[in-house]
UniProtKB/Swiss-Prot annotation:
Protein's gene: pdmA
EC number(s) on file: 1.14.15.38
Function according to Swiss-Prot or TrEMBL: Part of the multicomponent N,N-dimethyl phenylurea N-demethylase responsible for the initial N-demethylation step during the bacterial metabolism of N,N-dimethyl-substituted phenylurea herbicides. Catalyzes the mono-N-demethylation of N,N-dimethyl-substituted phenylurea herbicides to their mono-N-demethylated derivatives. Is active on isoproturon (IPU), chlorotoluron, metoxuron, monoron, diuron, fluometuron and fenuron, but cannot transform the N-methoxy-N-methyl-substituted herbicides.
Organism this protein belongs to: Sphingobium sp. (strain YBL2)
This protein's name: N,N-dimethyl phenylurea N-demethylase subunit alpha
Gene knockout outcome: Disruption mutant cannot degrade isoproturon and other N,N-dimethyl-substituted phenylurea herbicides.
Amino acid sequence: MFRYDQVAHLTDQAYIDDLCDRVEQGLDQGLLPSHVFRDERVFKVEMDRIFTRAWVFVAHETEIPKSGDFVLRKVGLDQVIVTRSAGGAINVLLNHCRHRGTEVCHEDSGNTTHFKCPYHGWIYKNDGDFVGAPAMREAYGGRLDSKKNGLLRAPQVESYHGFIFTCLSESGPSLSEYLGDVSWMLDAIVKLHPAGLKVLGAPERFIIRTDWKIGAENFAGDVYHIATAHLSVNETKYISQDMRDTLKTGGGYRFQNGHGFITHRSSEMVGAEGGLWAYGLNPEIRKQFDLEGFDDAQKKMLLEAPPVAGNIFPNFSYLRGALPANAGDLPVVFTNFRLWQPVEPGVMEVWNWQFSYDALPDEYNREAYAAGQLAFSAAGLFDQDDSAVWEGVAKLGGSPWGRKEEVMLHYGQQRVEPDSTYEGKGDYFPSTFGEFNQENFWREWVKQLRSDVRNEVPA
């Protein structure tokens, strides 16, 4: 019998293999083909291979705290419903009716026991089980097997510190295996307070006409751009730090599977009381945090070179900083997580969540939300800068002249060696210069694109 997934690879396979070869060879020389940021064939294979096999963040448990709660999300190009069913189980369901395929859910969030298809009225429980259809006995004469007609369920769904991830491949690694040592970094971010993090409202969403990988690799490892792209922030009244100082204090943490985080050695910027407290946490807030549950390497990292931004491959990023909610106020720490959601070649949608620690006062959290939106949002000081320059990269990626000339982008700063005295997980590089985390991202990207879809097609 004809199977599209058994033959679809034939047209593009040689092209993708050749591109992967050129990317790998280019990285050895510090170069990257520019058209990887806007190529229809590349985009299609990314959706088919990376986003159906990687663990992708879809929601936080505090978004669906009660039985019946749901949110509508994306895994690559697939729209999914993330639900909490009776008993507290979390489900990730493909948002398409098993009858004729239309969407069964059209709300971004809500609470319900069932989903009803608006086309022919097929009904499903909020865990995806098929319940019935109008005149089912007359229409189908008992031939409709309810056990085989539920909404498609993601085969793997796991939560880590409240962050819900899904993997659409039954044969993929567990979430723990996929995260690997980067879980050590996530622990340090989330477990500063035993109550953990919570979302501060629904995610903001906005379009940037650029490739999803640009945001991901930037947050994973690009300290170098801050002194130039964000220099305009110096002219505002919201921040006292000179953006050019980041050239002296940057660094990065590299982890397996393409994950990476960046830091500013804030203890060098503001002295021994830097690190975690340099973010602007006031004494009353500091009292609520506890470092005793961390190992010695985590404590040292948090107090001397804490994570400022990072990316969990492929497209889930983190950022923490401090700005005043209003000009002239004291700075307030904000914690931001976001998805670089692919839409089409050269276009992504940013899904932007503000977080805070669950036990902190509501007044503080309101200020943290305002500070986070001021810095990173559709109208944020930093996102406006990034959007403007990132769009130019995607334009070059689609340039007929640039493609004809095989324009290569430069990823060849000095080769920096990891700090041999570092005792934490992963590798630590105490330097702004050196694109170790971007290279790490791209080598994982090549690895995923080389994973031939034929390997998972049943005989």
